[in-house]
């Protein structure tokens, strides 16, 4: 269950699981030709691996092609995905060749529209995913 604290919305792992399942359903219903998946570092890595496992689509071996689904956690300002497209524009003939999927899409603030999204987020709250929590131990606190 999403926990609201001030202007922040904290998602649980269960919330993420629901969003990933919803995104997987949209991916299979889209009939997109997807051969592999690539997660944008850092926020897109975990959802990308989850989608890869659920759908049995491999993670890319390093080469991004028009058949690669690019996954990120959120498309808020859209700048990350827009910059990614600019970086790879020589690889893609048209913007619609770039297949993108996100857990949350904020159309009211984004300059980029993802191909697929699990949830359209209309709140101005900042979304905090479980992998972004500051309550984890730092690497120095672990004893081997």
Please provide the spans of the model-predicted regions.
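PRPP-associated nucleotide enzymes
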Residues: 1-144
């Amino acid at each position: 269950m999403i926990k609201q604290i001030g202007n922040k919305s904290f998602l649980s792992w269960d919330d993420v699981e629901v969003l990933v399942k919803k995104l997987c359903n949209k991916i299979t219903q889209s009939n997109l030709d997807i051969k592999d998946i690539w997660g944008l570092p850092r926020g897109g890595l975990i959802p990308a691996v989850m989608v890869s496992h659920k759908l049995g689509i491999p993670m890319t071996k390093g080469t991004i092609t028009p058949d690669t689904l690019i996954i990120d956690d959120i498309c808020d300002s859209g700048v990350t995905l827009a910059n990614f497209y600019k970086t790879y524009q020589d690889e893609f003939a048209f913007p619609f060749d770039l297949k993108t999927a996100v857990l949350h899409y904020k159309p009211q603030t984004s300059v980029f529209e993802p191909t697929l999204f699990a949830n359209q987020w209309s709140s101005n709250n900042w979304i905090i995913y479980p992998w972004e929590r500051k309550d984890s131990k730092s690497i120095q606190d672990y004893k081997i």
